[in-house]
């Protein structure tokens, strides 16, 4: 589905990755309402509809590990395509979205 810059991960894998690496950048590409209802701690809200217009603000994360998620894994691939097109090289995709997240969320 994705190129070699992108790795699909389960919620368990994602949890381990972000727990062990405080430099991980987490992008929640859902709506503000969805984000406010509960998100992964430390996640930055970047709705998929505005990601393209915010790409310059995200440029500082280009060389970092970036975890991208939405609700169920349907919108995040659109966001990931935009990131890949803008030379992000180390992207992790929460393949089933936050709906599969079995850990605490922040409100």
Regions found by a protein language model. Name each.
Residues 1-24, 32-65, 71-107:
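Rhodanese-like catalytic fold shared by cysteine-dependent sulfurtransferases
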